[in-house]
A protein has these predicted regions:
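The substrate-binding groove and active-site-proximal loops of carbohydrate-active enzymes
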Residues: 2-3, 54-66, 74-86, 108-128, ...
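Catalytic metal-binding/acid-base residues of hydrolase active sites
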Residues: 88, 110, 152-156, 188, ...
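Active-site neighborhood of glycoside hydrolase catalytic domains
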Residues: 100, 122-206, 225
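Alpha-helical scaffolding within the catalytic cores
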Residues: 35-39, 90-93, 126-138, 198, ...
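Secreted/periplasmic carbohydrate-active enzymes, especially glycoside hydrolases
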Residues: 1-92, 97, 101-105, 132, ...
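Flexible loop/turn segments at secondary-structure boundaries
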Residues: 91-93, 114-115, 155-159, 200-202, ...
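Substrate-binding clefts and catalytic carboxylate motifs of secreted carbohydrate-active enzymes
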Residues: 147-149, 172, 176, 181-184, ...
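Short, charged, surface-exposed secondary-structure boundary motifs
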Residues: 114-121, 202-204, 217-221, 238-240
Length: 336
C-alpha cells in the first residue's frame, strides 16, 4: 500500500460450530511499513515526505462518504497526499475512504485544548483521556492509511499562555508519557507519535510537530534532531487585510478574493520553506475551509441571497424514537 498504489486486501474470519457458521468477521487492510531513521520518515524502506491538509469536523455537511471523497480528491489535486482530522474522532468512513484513495492519515485524538477546551486541572480529564486514546487506537489501527498518532493538540501553549497555569505542566508531561506508552502497547507498528503544536512534548515524543512560527521556529524544530513537521501554518483563519497586505498591498483590502490572493502568496512561500528545510510533514491551515469555493447546495438562483425557508437541501420530518442524527436542512455554502 502506498498513496500512489493503495492496494487493499481482506481478512475473512468465520467461527463454526458443528459445521454451522455462527459468526463472521471481515477486516480490510493493506501491507506497508512506516519507519523513522534519524530525521527522516520512510515508507516501505524509501524516504517519504507527506504534504497534507487539516480541518475540524463541523457536523452534518461532512457526514457523508461523498464529502470525504471530495476533500481527499481536492488534496490529491493540490499535489498532496496526507490529512490530519483535527482534534476529534472522525466517522470511520473517512479512514475507509483514505484507505481506498491513498491518503495518509495523521490520526488525532480529542485530547486538545486550543484556547479553552478541557478542564485540565481535573483528575477526571486525565484519567478519561487514557481510556479515550486506548479505544481510539484499537478502533483505527488496522487502517492502512493511518501513518501515525497525534496524541494531543496545543495543550501546552494553552496551559502556559491561555490559562497561565505553568504548575499544570508536570501533569501534562506525565500524560504525554502515558499516552505514548498506550500507543506503543496497542499499536507497536507505527513509530510516529506526535503532539500537534507542542514540539516533541518536552523531549518525550519521537517526532517534533510545530504550529505557525517563522524560519527561526523551523530551525529550532530541526535542531531538536528528530523527524519534524508542521501541523498548522499561515494566517488564513486570522489574518486581517492589514496583515495580508504585506504580501499584495492594497489588493488585500479590496475584496475577499484580494485577501485570498495575498494568502496564496504567503502559503506558497511557507510550503517552499518547509520542503527546502526537510519537513517530513508539511501543511498550511488550511485548504478545505479557506481555499475552496463553497458550493451553493440546494440554491438555484444565485443572484439572490439565500433564505432559510427556500434554499438548501431539506430532509424529511423528524421521527420520534429513531436512532441517529436527523437533520432538518443543509444550507447553501456550508461545505467549506
Amino acid at each position: 500500500w502506498t498513496p500512489e498504489q493503495p492496494n487493499l486486501y481482506a481478512l475473512l474470519l468465520s467461527v463454526n460450530n458443528q459445521k454451522q457458521t455462527v459468526d463472521t468477521k471481515y477486516e480490510r487492510f493493506g501491507w506497508r511499513e512506516w519507519t523513522l531513521q534519524g530525521t527522516t520518515q520512510y515508507l516501505n524502506g524509501e524516504p517519504y515526505a507527506l504534504h497534507g491538509d487539516s480541518w475540524h469536523f463541523m457536523g452534518i455537511p461532512q457526514m457523508t462518504r461523498r464529502y470525504a471523497w471530495a476533500w481527499f480528491t481536492a488534496i490529491k489535486g493540490m499535489n498532496a497526499n496526507a490529512v490530519r482530522p483535527h482534534a476529534q474522532v472522525y466517522p470511520r468512513f473517512y479512514l475507509d475512504m483514505a484507505d481506498e484513495m491513498g491518503i495518509c492519515v495523521l490520526n488525532e485524538t480529542a485530547n486538545w485544548a486550543s484556547d479553552g477546551g478541557p478542564k485540565l486541572d481535573s483528575d477526571l480529564f486525565w484519567e478519561a483521556s487514557k481510556e479515550h486514546l486506548k479505544r481510539f487506537v484499537l478502533r483505527d489501527r488496522n487502517h492502512a492509511s493511518v501513518f501515525g498518532w497525534s496524541i494531543s493538540n496545543e495543550n501546552k501553549p494553552v496551559i502556559l499562555h491561555v490559562y497561565n497555569r505553568p504548575e499544570l505542566m508536570p501533569v501534562q508531561k506525565k500524560a504525554w508519557e502515558e499516552w505514548r506508552d498506550i500507543v506503543h502497547q496497542y499499536d507497536p507498528t507505527r513509530p510516529w507519535i506526535s503532539a500537534d503544536g507542542e514540539d516533541d512534548g518536552d523531549g518525550i515524543l519521537p517526532v517534533t510537530v510545530g504550529h505557525y512560527g517563522d524560519i527561526n521556529s523551523m530551525k529550532r524544530w530541526i535542531e531538536i534532531g528528530k523527524p519534524w513537521g508542521i501541523g498548522e501554518h499561515s494566517m488564513a483563519y486570522y489574518g486581517t487585510p492589514e496583515q495580508v497586505a504585506k504580501y499584495n498591498g492594497e489588493r488585500a483590502y479590496e475584496s475577499q478574493e484580494g485577501r485570498m490572493e495575498g494568502l496564496a502568496n504567503e502559503c506558497y512561500n511557507l510550503i517552499v520553506n518547509q520542503r527546502q528545510m526537510g519537513a517530513s510533514y508539511s501543511t498550511v491551515f488550511n485548504m478545505a475551509w479557506y481555499a475552496l469555493k463553497p458550493l451553493p447546495l440546494g440554491k438555484k438562483d444565485k443572484s439572490k441571497a439565500p433564505t432559510v425557508e427556500a434554499d438548501g437541501v431539506f430532509f424529511g420530518d423528524y421521527k420520534e424514537g429513531v436512532p441517529g442524527v436527523q437533520p432538518e436542512r443543509v444550507g447553501p455554502y456550508c461545505t467549506t
